[in-house]
């Protein structure tokens, strides 16, 4: 598999956690949190990050219910993934994000904003599943 840079998103209506990683090292790390409820401001910042990091694909956490079923947040994550695909023409992968925020809190050891760490957890799951 050729080396690829990846960005991952832990999508929320109030904030979006972002992580970066690549297929060579197969390691993910938190990048930043976008604190904005204004859609265009979010996409402006995402566009800047995409230009800066030039990822070949992006990963979006899919908010499934605890039983694995869909819930209202699942549709919002799918819509966000479709917007990324449509606006930027990137390959988008969806990854089950169940438990990522709890794991992020455990890793942080605090109740600080954990969205970027949760995005790194989601991306690490994707990288770990690669052949």
Curated annotation (Swiss-Prot):
Which InterPro entries does the entry mention? RNaseH-like_sf, YqgF, YqgF/RNaseH-like_dom, YqgF/RNaseH-like_dom_sf
Localization: Cytoplasm
User: Could you identify this protein by its name?
Assistant: Putative pre-16S rRNA nuclease
> What's the superkingdom here?
Bacteria
Question: GO terms for biological process?
Answer: rRNA 5'-end processing
Q: One MF term in GO for this entry? A: nuclease activity
The principal localisation class reads cytoplasm
SMART domains tied to this protein: YqgFc
Pfam families membership: RuvX
Instruction: Please give the function described in this protein's UniProt entry.
Output: Could be a nuclease involved in processing of the 5'-end of pre-16S rRNA.
Species this chain originates from = Bordetella petrii (strain ATCC BAA-461 / DSM 12804 / CCUG 43448)
Keywords for this protein: Cytoplasm, Hydrolase, Nuclease, Ribosome biogenesis
Q: Would you tell me the Gene Ontology cellular component terms?
A: cytosol
Q: Which family does it belong to?
A: Belongs to the YqgF nuclease family.
Gene3D superfamilies named among the record's database cross-references: YqgF/RNase H-like domain
Question: CDD domains, per this entry?
Answer: YqgF
Entry EC no(s): 3.1.-.-
């Amino acid at each position: 598999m050729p080396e690829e840079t990846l960005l991952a998103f832990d999508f929320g209506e109030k904030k979006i956690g972002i992580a970066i990683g690549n297929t060579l090292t197969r390691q993910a790390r938190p990048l930043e949190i976008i604190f904005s409820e204004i859609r265009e401001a979010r996409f402006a910042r995402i566009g800047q990050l995409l230009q800066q990091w030039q990822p070949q694909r992006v990963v979006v956490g899919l908010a499934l219910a605890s039983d694995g079923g869909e819930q209202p947040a699942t549709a919002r994550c799918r819509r966000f993934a479709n917007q990324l695909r449509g606006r930027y023409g990137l390959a988008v992968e969806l990854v089950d994000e169940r438990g990522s925020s709890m794991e992020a809190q455990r890793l942080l050891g605090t109740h600080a904003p954990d969205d970027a760490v949760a995005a790194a957890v989601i991306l690490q799951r994707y990288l770990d599943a690669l052949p």
